[in-house]
């Protein structure tokens, strides 16, 4: 299956009438998302563009997965998605009980403290996701970013057309800050502690 054909294939899927081929396309798309070969959003000419079909694939993926028990040593979870297991192969450091969910991608050199990175998220090399921070679904985090303790980066799977949160290279997000609703934090920006940024936050 070729990546360049996936957009058309996903766009033509009827969620109410899934064929075996449709299921294979959905599984393959999330597999490529998990490997970092495709992304929910991509940058072109200093603008971030939403790849709506990738997010559609995530929603379809949830619809075809069943809940099941997932073991992590003595811990038992009940969910549709397993956490990633190839941290060493990826070259990322994950401190217990940190979780990077299947379908998220972290470049080599990322440090994940006890925190959570959700499906569709992309985290660039050299970034620190500090203790109890959350990187929500589809969020795009650049290289050498510091997400301080307790930071909440909002996730966006719905509604259709909504942009994910983007934090660009070299940004610093202060402790307990909340960034949601498709906010774009540009390269090298510094956000102080306990700041909340939403799509309606006035910037003066």
Predicted feature residues:
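Structural signal for interior beta-strand "rungs" in well-ordered beta-sheet cores
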Residues: 92-204
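Terminal amphipathic alpha-helical/low-complexity segments used for targeting or macromolecular assembly
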Residues: 1-92
């Amino acid at each position: 299956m070729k990546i360049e054909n996936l957009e058309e294939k996903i766009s033509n899927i009827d969620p109410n009438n899934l064929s075996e081929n449709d299921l294979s396309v959905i599984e393959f798309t999330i597999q490529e998302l998990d490997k970092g070969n495709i992304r929910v959003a991509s940058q072109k000419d200093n603008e971030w563009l939403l790849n709506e079909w990738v997010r559609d694939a995530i929603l379809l993926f949830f619809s075809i997965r069943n809940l099941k028990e997932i073991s992590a040593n003595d811990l038992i979870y009940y969910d549709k998605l397993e956490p990633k297991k190839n941290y060493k192969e990826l070259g990322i450091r994950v401190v217990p009980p940190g979780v990077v969910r299947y379908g998220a991608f972290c470049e080599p050199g990322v440090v994940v403290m006890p925190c959570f990175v959700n499906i569709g998220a992309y985290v660039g090399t050299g970034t620190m996701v500090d203790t109890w921070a959350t990187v929500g679904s589809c969020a795009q985090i650049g290289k050498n970013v510091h997400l301080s303790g307790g930071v909440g980066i909002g996730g966006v799977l719905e509604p259709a057309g909504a942009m994910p949160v983007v934090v660009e290279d070299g940004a610093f997000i202060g402790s307990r800050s909340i960034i949601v609703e498709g906010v774009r934090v540009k390269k090298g920006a510094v956000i102080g502690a306990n700041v909340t940024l939403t799509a309606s936050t006035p910037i003066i």
